[in-house]
Amino acid sequence: AYFVEMQKLQEEYAGKLNIRIGIELGLRTYLKDYYEELTKKYPFDFVIGSVHNVPYKKDVEGNILYTDPAAEKLFADRTDKEAYRLMMETTLENVRTFGLLSNNLVIWIML
């Protein structure tokens, strides 16, 4: 619905406004295939990749738990330096995993 409506606006305002269609994706490495399909299906003018969550510990079953980078629990059991390193490592892992999802991908890291 979003993409179709934006295309209608592009047509309606052609010659008056240069309307671009974009999307922001909260990056998690396990969503790579889904994001690749999405960006192939819709020819976005730009895609913003962001990091809103970082892994901070595992639960008793070994599942990775994520938290907001600004959350106190990220800093609870580690030094500031360790917490910031974890955020940067998560960002780097996403950049390595996603590279360019398509020719129009722009990665903006938001922590």
Question: Which residues are covered by each model-predicted region?
Answer:
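Extended substrate/RNA-proximal surfaces in nucleic-acid metabolism proteins
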Residues: 2-111
